[in-house]
Amino acid sequence: MHNDNSRYRGLFGFVVRRPRLILAAALILSLISVLYTWKTMTFLTSRVDLMPKNTQFHTDYRAWRQDFGDMEDIVVVIEAEDQELAGRFGLELHARLALKPEIIRELFFPFGLDFFRRNGLLFMPVADLQSLRDNLLLAKPVLRELAAAPSVQTLFSTLTGQMERYLAAPSAAGAERDLVGISFMLTSLGSGIRQFGESGAASFSLQEVFFRGKDGKESALARAGKMQILTALPVRSEGSFVPAELAISLIRTEIDSLKKRPEFKGVTVGLTGVPVLEHEEMATSDRDVKTATALSLVLTVILLLVAFRGLRNVAAAMIALVIAICLSFGFATLTVGRLNILSAVFAVMLIGIGIEYGIQVVLRSQEELARGADPLDAIAAGLNRNIWGIVMAAATVAAAFLTFTLTDFKGVSELGIIAAGGVAICVLVTFTVLPALLVLFMPGNGAQEAGAGKGMKPLSGSALQCPAVLGQFLFGHPKRVIALAIILCIASLFPLSRIGFDYNLLNLQAKGLESVTYAYKLMKSKENSGYFAVVVADSAADAEAKARRLESLPTVDHVVSLNSFVPDRQPEKIALLHSLRRDLSDVQPKPYSEDLQLMELPEVFERFRTTVARLKAELDRGKRNEAVPVGEFLKTLDAFFARLEKNRNSNALGMLRDFQGGMLAELPEKLKLLMATLEPSPVSSADVPQELVKRFKGKSGKYLLQVAPRNEIFDREPLEAFLRDVRSVDPHATGEPVMVYESMTIMRDAYRGAFLYALAAIVAILLVAFRSVKFAVIGLVPLLVGLLFMVAGMWVFGISFNPANIIVMPLVLGIAVDSGIYLINRYRNEGEPAEVVVTSSTGVGVFLNTLTIMASFGALMVAHHQGVFSIGVVMSLGMVACQVAFVVVLPAVLKLVEGR
C-alpha cells in the first residue's frame, strides 16, 4: 500500500513532503552556528562584569579602580622557616618574571625593597624591640664566639664553658642572668636539632631565636618574614576563557624550576588572588561541564534505548537534540555574545529539557502504531496531538527563564535570554527536524510497507504496566494519597524555614585547590591579609583620622595606608637600636669554614652531654623551673647522638656536615645583616619608595586605606558586621569584600524575584491555556508538592542553597508545571480516566522526561567544582520530588475530581 503524502496538511504536511530539505537546512544552520560560536563567543570570568553597573557600590568600585589602577594581582605566597631563604627565593622569582613584561605587567615584592631591609626593625613595637635586645644580650657570649669561628665545636664548647662556670658558683653575682642565657640558648639549639631530625636540615634562624617576646611568641616581623608575598599584575587576554592563564602558567613554571634547586630546600610556595581563583574556577567548571555534558548524552541515549526499544527512534531524537543544542549556541552568540560562569551550564540544561518534547512525540507515535495506525499517520498523530501541550509546557519553562531578564544581575539576565531562546529552538526542532528524521528513518522512506511492524516498534496495550497492589493504592484511595501528601507538605514547612543560603564563594570551588587553601591562609595571617576593604581619604591628615577611627572598631584588625610606612616612636626606637649595636660591637662575623675537626668532636660532644646532665641534676636539686626545659633539651640531644651512632659506619660524617652547614653556614651573613639594621636613620614620608606611593596614592592625589578584618569574613554574618563597621566611617567603602557582599545580595534577590515572576507568569499561562480556574489550580499541585519535597530533601541531606544551585529554583518551577500540563491536557482532551492517563504514552513520557532531566543534571555530580556539583544534587532532588508529585499526587487529585 502506498501512502498519499498529499493528504497531510499543515506543519506535518510540509515536513512529510520535504524531509531531506528540512534536515539539510538544519545541518547547514547547525554547522554555521558552531563555526560562528567558535570564532565569536567570548567568556566573562570576572564576577564584577556580571553585576549591575548603575548601583552605588559599583560606582564606588569603578572610581577606586580608575584612580588607583587594577589591583587584581596574582598573589604568590612564599613560606620558609628562614626569612632570608624565603626572601632569596622571592628575589630570584621577581628577577625571572621581570623578564616577561608582555605577560606580567607589574611586580611588587616588599622584601626586595631596600627600604624595608634597612628600616624593618623600626616597624616593630617598642616592646618587641626590647625583647629582641634582651634575647640578643642573653645570646651575646655564644654569638661572639660563633661569629669568630662558626662551627659545631665552637657552639658546643662555648655552651659547655658557660654551664661549667655556672655550676662552679651557682650563687655568685650574675649567676642568675647566666642561667637565663644558658636556658635560652639550649632551648634554641634544641629547636634546631629537632628540625634537623624532622627534615634533615637545620637552620640557626635569627628570627626563630631572637625575634620572640617574653611570652615566647614570635613577633609580627618574624611571622611576616616566614610568609612573604610577591604580587604580579597579569596582562589579561580579554575575551579569553581564562584571561590570566599565560601569567599563571609562567609563574608556576618558574616556581617549579626554582624549587628544584637545592639551595631552596624547605621553601613552600602557593598561588592565590582573584585572577587565580577565577582561573581555577573557570578551568575546573569548564572541564566539569564538558565531562557532564558527555555523560549526560550517554545516559540520555541509554534511557531512550530502554524507552523506545529501537535504534532508529533514539537516533532521530538524539540527532534532533544535538541540532537544537548547536542552533542554541548560535543563538546565544548572536544575542548575548558571551558566556559566564552561570550560563556556561545551559547546554546541560537543554539536554534534559530539550529531549522531553521529542519523547512525547515519539511515544505517542508508538502508541498510535500499537493501535494499528499507518506509520505516517502515527507520526502525524504524535506531532499534532502534542503540539498544544508542548507549546504550553515550553511556554512555562521559557517564562521561568525569561523572568531572569527582569533582574538587575547581568549574569542571571543573560542566562535567562540564552536558556529561553534555547527552549524555543528545541520546540522548533521538535516540530520540524524530528518528524523529518522519523519519516526518513522509516523503511523505504515511508513510501512502502505501511504496516506497523516495519517502522517504529509499537507500545502494546497500556504503555506502562502498573502492579495491581500499587495501582489499587494510587488510584483506588485518592483521598488517602492526598491526605498523606498534605501531611508531608505540612511537615516540609519546617525544613523550608530552616534551609540556609551559603554566601561563601570559596565553598563553590573544588575541594583542595591551592588557591583556596592560600586564600584562607592569608585571611588568618594578621601580617599579610590579602582580603581587605578599601577606604579612600582626601589627604594624609584625613587618612590618619580615618585610620584611627577604623582601628577602634571591633571588627577591624588594622589599617594599612601610606602613613603606615612612616614608623611611630622613632626617636625611642632608634636610640634603643643604636644602644644595642654598641653592646654588640665585639660580635665580629668571620667567614664560615666547613672544617669539622673530626678528631676533637667525640670529646666535645661527650663533655657537652655530661655538663648538660650535671646542670639538669643541679637544677632538680634546687627545684628550679629551668630544670624542665633543660631536661627536654637533654632528651633531644640524646636522640640526636643516637642517630649519629646508628649511622656511625655509613653516613654519620654526612649528617654532621649537613647539621653544621644548615645551622651555621649562613650565620655570618645573617649577623652582618642584623648589624646593619641596628643603625637606622629617621624615616619621613619623603623616604617611602615610589613603589609604595604608587599603590597607596591615586592619580587624583587621594590616599588609599586597606582595612583588614579581625576575623574571617568569607561567611555572610561576619562579613556583614565588618562592612557595617567600615561603612560607619566611610559609606563609600569598596574593595573585594564589598563587591562580594553586594553581588551575593543582588543575586539572591534576583533569583527570589525571578521565582515570583515565574510563578505569576505560569499561573497566567495555566489560566489562559486551560480556561479553567479548577484545572489551573490542579496544574499547580506538582509545583507546590515538588518544591516542598525538594527543600525537605535538601534539609535532610544537609544541603544549603548557594549562588550556583539557586539557579535551579525557577527551572524546577517550570518543569514541575510543564509535565503536569501533558497529563492534564490528555485527561481533558481525550476523556480517559486518571489511571489510564498516567500509564499511557503521555504518562510514560512524563516519567521518562523526569528521568532524562535527572540524568542530565545528575551528570553534574561528577564535577569537582562544588557549585556545579550542587546544581546536579539540587536538581536531582527536585526531579525525584516532582516525579512523586506526577506519579502519585497528581493522579490522585485527577481521580478525585473525575465526574465533577
How would you describe each model-predicted region?
Residues 2-294:
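Membrane-proximal extracytoplasmic
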Residues 110-118, 563-575, 738-744:
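Short proline/glycine- and acidic-rich turn/helix-capping motifs at secondary-structure junctions
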Residues 102-103, 555-558:
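Glycine-centered tight turns that cap/initiate beta-strands
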Residues 573-639:
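Charged, amphipathic alpha-helical linkers/stalks
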Residues 1-48, 56-63, 236-242, 246-508, ...:
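Membrane-embedded transmembrane helical bundles of large multi-pass transporters/channels
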Residues 37-81, 88, 203-219, 471-480, ...:
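Solvent-exposed, non-transmembrane loop/terminal regulatory segments of multi-pass membrane proteins
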Residues 164-310, 613-758:
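Extracytoplasmic
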Residues 118-134, 467, 570-586, 746-756:
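Short, low-order "capping/linker" segments at domain edges
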